[in-house]
Each structure stands twice: as C-alpha cells, then as structure tokens.
Swiss-Prot record:
SUPFAM superfamilies, A to Z: L-aspartase-like
Complex and partners: Homooligomer. Residues from neighboring subunits contribute catalytic and substrate-binding residues to each active site.
UniProt organism field: Aquifex aeolicus (strain VF5)
Known function: Catalyzes two reactions in de novo purine nucleotide biosynthesis. Catalyzes the breakdown of 5-aminoimidazole- (N-succinylocarboxamide) ribotide (SAICAR or 2-[5-amino-1-(5-phospho-beta-D-ribosyl)imidazole-4-carboxamido]succinate) to 5-aminoimidazole-4-carboxamide ribotide (AICAR or 5-amino-1-(5-phospho-beta-D-ribosyl)imidazole-4-carboxamide) and fumarate, and of adenylosuccinate (ADS or N(6)-(1,2-dicarboxyethyl)-AMP) to adenosine monophosphate (AMP) and fumarate.
InterPro entries hit by this protein: AdenyloSucc_lyase_C, Fumarase/histidase_N, Fumarate_lyase_CS, Fumarate_lyase_fam, Fumarate_lyase_N, L-Aspartase-like, Pur_lyase
Keywords, ordered alphabetically: Lyase, Purine biosynthesis
Annotated catalytic residues: 144 (proton donor/acceptor), 265 (proton donor/acceptor)
Stored SMART domains: ADSL_C (SM00998)
The protein's annotated pathway: Purine metabolism; AMP biosynthesis via de novo pathway; AMP from IMP: step 2/2; Purine metabolism; IMP biosynthesis via de novo pathway; 5-amino-1-(5-phospho-D-ribosyl)imidazole-4-carboxamide from 5-amino-1-(5-phospho-D-ribosyl)imidazole-4-carboxylate: step 2/2
Protein name: Adenylosuccinate lyase
Binding site for N(6)-(1,2-dicarboxyethyl)-AMP: 4-5, 70-72, 96-97, 215, 266, 271-273, 310-314
GO MF terms held by the record: (S)-2-(5-amino-1-(5-phospho-D-ribosyl)imidazole-4-carboxamido) succinate lyase (fumarate-forming) activity; N6-(1,2-dicarboxyethyl)AMP AMP-lyase (fumarate-forming) activity
Reaction(s) catalysed (UniProt annotation): N(6)-(1,2-dicarboxyethyl)-AMP = fumarate + AMP; (2S)-2-[5-amino-1-(5-phospho-beta-D-ribosyl)imidazole-4-carboxamido]succinate = 5-amino-1-(5-phospho-beta-D-ribosyl)imidazole-4-carboxamide + fumarate
One GO cellular component term noted in the UniProt record for this chain: cytosol
C-alpha cells in the first residue's frame, strides 16, 4: 500500500523487518522443540538464541543473497545461519519453506487483526456516543431516497453500531480460523520432522495445528479473512455514503468536520466537500476487490503450487493497511461530525405531513373500511397535497370521506412525528442492553 494511506503501527506489522523477525521466531521455536527432544545440544540452542537477529541491515543481506539464490527462504536461512557459525546447521532442520512462511504469516495476521479490532472498538464507541446524544434528534427517514416516516439520528446510529458489532464478531471468528500453523514438511507427512516438534513449536507460538496440512496451511482460511475485511470495508462505505448524501447542499443535515485552513476546491473557494467519506468509499472498493483473488488462491495444484504467494504479498498488507486507515479516518469523521438539527426539522416540513399517510390508512381500516378503499382515499388526499400548496392535514380535512370517519383530533395525533417513535427505547434496549443504564 502506498505511504499516503499507511499508518505507522500497521505499516510496521507488514514491514520486511517484521516479516523476517517472524520467520526467525518460527525457526527458533522449532530449534527449541528439537532441543527438548534431545536432537539439538543445549549449548547450540543457546548460541542460536543469542546470536540470531533481524534488523534493516540483515534484511539487505537477505535481499542480496536472494538475487543469487532466487529463493527468499533459502537466502534468509543462509544469512541467519552465518550469524551463528557452526551451530547454524541446526537452523531449518527438517523444515520446508512453507513451514516457516505459513506459520509466520499467521503471526503477522494476528498482529494485524488485533490492531483492526482496536480500531473497530474506537469507532463503535463514537457511534454509541452519537446514538445517545441524538436519541431525540428528529429527522426524516428515507426509503428509495424519498421521505418515508419520522426517524431520529440516534436510531440511525443504533443501526450503524449493531452492524459494526456484527462485523467485529465476524472478524473474531475469522481470527480463530486463520491462526493455524504447520511444521509438517514438504507434503504434510512429517517425513523429516516428528509431530512432537510441531506440537511444541506451535504451542510456544500460540498457534493451532492445521489438522490435515499439505505443504501449506490451506487458503480457504485466508479467503475467509479477506472476505471479512471486505465486509467491514463495505459497512464503512455504507456509512460514508450516508454522510455524503446527507451533506448534499439540498439536504445539509450532517457535515464532515472542516478544519481551520482547510480548502475544499482549487477553483471554488466556497466548497465544503465530504472528501474523507469519499476517500473511505474509494479505498473500500480496493479492500473488497481483494477478496476475489483471495478466493482464487484457494485453488492450488495438488499438495501446493506457488501461484498464491505473489498475490498474498500484495492483498494481505494492502487490505489490512487500507482498512486500518479508513477505520481511523471514519473515527475522526465521527468525532467532529456536525449534526444540523434545524435543517433536519426544516427538511421534515418539505413533505407537508405526508409521512403520516400510513397512520391515516390504519385509522380508516380500524373504522371499518376495506384496506383497498382506505388506500385510495389516503392516496387521493396525498396526491392533492403533492400537487398543490396545501398540507396533508388540509387535504384530509377537506375530504368528506375522511372526515366522515376521523375527527380533527385523530388526524392531529396521527401527524405528530413522535407518535412514530414511541418505541425507540425498545430499539435502544435491543442494541445496547445493559449499557442503557
């Protein structure tokens, strides 16, 4: 991922230095396992533990060797073994490259997922704050982009909060399914390494054992993870799109924060554009798109080919880095979000009370009219309001078939927006439960 969208913490996870450090963690864990089984002398293990390291200079040496070897793992093993000397012969004993690479990849993924989980928690806290702060902030609910029924901005935040909670649960599930390693040799048969080494090494690394590995940990695990990252990005795009719609000049119900000195357009000094929400929408496309090659990586030849490797070097870092970036960007948007309550009220008035059509329909059917007949009456009055300067209340009171069954007081009550929202506490209880207190 380009530097512009890379935050340091996540960028460090996917750095070359950290990758090779994780490879070294795996190699040392395997050496310790061999030592416990009496196959590596204790003094040799001690030297391996004390002498081996990875920093930027070591990474450069590995890259230089790779130019000759055309194999990054062999280059890594050669450089690390040189650090130790004679005892370096024990490094990589009985292993195949994927024993190291796939197991280390799980360690990298664990670090990356845990950062994303922290990001999600931050975002959820801000959404929750807005939900309670705007529990009674009246606005118009829209379906198909058209005014529907009264709503509150707080209820909109309840929807966002619950969706992010689902995404967090999905990520935790994907985390459980992807934190697997394997130390089982070239085709998973433990031909040059006993299962005890795998058990001891993976236990030290905090990973589970792939039950039926081949040369690799199977890529359906990683595909599930990438799909989950795409789902999280899709939710963020959904929320960002909502902000973009609500920031339209004609709507202007919410606005992204606009900081001192910020400029919106090179040509039009008046502009306040929802650029951060637009950026979220753009990067979400990249993250979501990466789930497709992840699923294609599931299809490998026989016990393994290398077609997935080049793909993962791109899609895993890019997806995590971009998602980390847009989660934090969305958090900043929420922190400074401007909610225009007065504009929400004025926009409600544009529909002239037509949002009450459903309640008038119910009232008429309760008076004994058939639903079809009542529907025709209400629609007739609604169309008159749309096509004239009159309010819905006025057209209802002018219609003798309405006033034959409904009093003005009943119509007034039906037009009260809070009549639509009397059960909002129930929604909050469902979403927040004990947190309501």
């Amino acid at each position: 991922m380009i530097e512009r969208y890379t935050r340091k913490e996540m960028g460090d996870v996917w750095s070359e230095v950290n990758k090779f450090k994780k490879w070294l963690d795996v190699e040392i864990a395997v050496c310790r396992a061999w030592a416990k089984l009496g196959k590596i002398p204790r003094d040799a293990l001690k030297k391996i533990e004390e002498k081996t390291y990875v920093d930027k200079k070591v990474v450069e040496k590995i890259k230089e060797k790779e130019k000759v070897f055309k194999h990054d793992v062999l280059a890594f093993v050669s450089v690390i073994a040189e650090q130790v000397g004679e005892e370096g012969r024990y490094i990589h004993m009985g292993l195949t490259s994927s024993d190291v690479v796939d197991t280390a990849l799980a360690l990298l993924i664990r670090e990356a997922i845990d950062i994303i989980l922290k990001d999600i928690d931050k975002v959820m806290e801000e959404i929750k704050r807005l939900a309670f702060e705007h529990k009674d902030t009246l606005m118009m609910g829209r379906t198909h982009g058209v005014h529907a029924e009264p709503y509150t901005f707080g209820l909109k935040m309840c929807v966002w909060y619950d969706e992010m909670r689902r995404q967090k649960e999905r990520l935790l599930f994907a985390r459980e399914n992807v934190l697997y390693g394997k130390i089982s040799g070239a085709v998973g048969t433990y031909s040059n390494i006993p299962p005890e080494v795998e058990k001891l090494a993976l236990e030290e690394l905090g990973l589970k054992i792939e039950p039926a590995s081949t040369q690799i940990v199977h890529r359906d695990r990683h595909a599930q993870l990438l799909t989950t990252l795409g789902l999280i990005a899709s939710s963020l795009e959904k929320f960002a799109t909502e902000i973009r719609h609500l920031q339209r000049t004609e709507v202007l119900e919410v606005l992204e924060p606009f900081t001192k000195g910020q400029r919106g357009s090179s040509a039009m000094p008046h502009k306040k554009n929802p650029i951060h929400s637009e950026r979220i929408c753009g990067l979400a496309r990249v993250i979501r798109a990466n789930s497709i090659p992840a699923m294609e990586d599931v299809v490998l030849w026989h016990e393994r080919d290398i077609s997935h490797s080049s793909v993962e070097r791109v899609i895993l870092p890019d997806s995590f880095i971009a998602l980390d970036y847009i989660l934090n960007l969305f958090y900043e948007i929420l922190k400074g979000l401007v909610v225009n309550k007065e504009r929400m009220r004025k926009n409600m008035e544009l529909s002239k009370g037509l949002y009450a059509s459903s309640k008038i329909l119910v009232l008429l059917t309760q008076k004994g009219l058939s639903r079809d007949y009542a529907y025709d009456i209400v629609q007739r009055c609604a169309m008159k309001a749309w096509e004239s300067d009159k309010t819905f209340k006025e057209t209802l009171l002018e219609d003798p078939e309405v006033t034959k069954y409904l009093t003005e007081e009943e119509i007034e009550k039906a037009l009260d927006p809070w009549e639509f929202l009397k059960n909002r506490d129930y929604v909050y209880e469902k979403v927040f439960g004990d947190e309501m207190g």
